[in-house]
């Protein structure tokens, strides 16, 4: 080999090494500063979904009948402490004096976007029609907004929704809400909140490590519905680690204590509320919760189309219950379970 050829190869390897070092450095930067990625997603999503933390309501407050005959009150301010502290209440009809159980719902959106008005930008189905259909089954439905990254992180949304519970307790008579028959439900990120609040309310040790004094008592929460909650951090894909890691600390590299606080499956005991688990994209997490609930002897139902039908369903598939037979079956099973718990 000539000296000239050898020199060219040497130069090539140096250039490739430099490029590799730059790529590794960029990857490390992104993985330890995840808001760079999530912020870009927020910017791309901002035209269609809420990605902001706002002290003013997203919409004009209104009260009255919907086209489907349900009665709604929107943009009720439940706290002055955090932005996005608004909720809507929907009743099956205008007769609000009828005693009905209360279902409190938290939307998804990776903690970077979404709202009670629109739902989850990461789910491919219509969460708003799902809520109408739940309400039509005889529930007063409370749809709650909460804070987003980058200004707020875990456990801020839990602290905030605890304030929403306090507001609902204080104003239960005003809004004709039965706060002794409560069901909590969430989809995706909202399912994470729901799952964790289930432990905050029923396990004093978990509440203590998060610094939360729960407003609701365990006996008030008759059931929880976890719609595809990513909870087992070590089993996440890199994409989910970016979203959840960003929510927890702004990095995918969570310590064991941070994971221990985040994954409330580790804190499930016999006092955890009766539970519906809907598993699709995060079926592994829902199966892990299923195992914990079995060990704790907690009544629950796991709805897992992959295990039951060998079908891979999309994230939060139950929201497609108007158009898809598998989703409709899941909806019917979910509603049947929680109806039994609120009797």
Segments predicted by a language model, with ranges:
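Alpha/beta-hydrolase superfamily serine-hydrolase fold, recognizing
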Residues: 7-343
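Juxtamembrane low-complexity tails/linkers enriched in Ser/Thr-Pro and polybasic
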Residues: 1-6
């Amino acid at each position: 080999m000539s000296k000239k050829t050898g020199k060219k190869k040497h130069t090539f390897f140096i250039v490739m090494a430099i490029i590799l070092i730059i790529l590794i450095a960029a990857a490390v930067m992104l993985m330890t500063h995840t808001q760079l990625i999530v912020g870009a997603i927020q910017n791309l999503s901002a035209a269609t979904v809420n990605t902001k933390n706002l002290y003013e309501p997203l919409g004009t407050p209104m009260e009255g009948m919907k086209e489907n005959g349900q009665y709604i009150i929107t943009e009720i301010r439940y706290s002055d402490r955090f932005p996005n502290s608004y909720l809507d209440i929907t009743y099956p009809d205008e007769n609000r004096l009828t005693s009905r159980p209360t279902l409190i719902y938290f939307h998804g959106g990776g903690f970077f976007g979404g709202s009670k008005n629109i739902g989850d930008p990461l789910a491919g189905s219509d969460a708003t029609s799902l809520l109408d259909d739940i309400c039509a089954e005889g529930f007063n439905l409370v749809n709650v907004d909460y804070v987003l990254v980058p200004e707020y992180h875990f456990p801020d949304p839990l602290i905030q929704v605890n304030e929403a519970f306090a507001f609902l307790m204080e104003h239960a008579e005003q809004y004709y809400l039965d706060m002794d028959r409560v069901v909590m439900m969430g989809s995706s990120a909202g399912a994470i909140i729901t799952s964790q609040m289930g432990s905050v309310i029923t396990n004093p040790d978990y509440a203590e490590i998060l610094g939360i004094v729960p407003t609701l008592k365990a006996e008030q929460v008759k059931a929880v519905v976890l719609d595809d909650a990513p909870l087992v951090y070590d089993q996440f894909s890199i994409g989910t680690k970016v979203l959840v890691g960003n929510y927890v600390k702004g990095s995918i590299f969570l310590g064991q204590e941070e994971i221990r606080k985040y994954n409330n499956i580790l804190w499930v005991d016999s006092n955890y509320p009766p539970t519906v688990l809907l598993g699709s994209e995060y079926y592994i997490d829902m199966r892990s919760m299923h195992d914990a609930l079995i060990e704790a002897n907690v009544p629950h139902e796991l709805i897992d189309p992959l295990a039951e039908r060998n079908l891979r369903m999309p994230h939060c598939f139950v929201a497609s219950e108007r158009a898809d037979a598998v989703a409709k079956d899941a909806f019917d099973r979910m509603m049947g379970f929680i109806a039994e718990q609120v009797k």
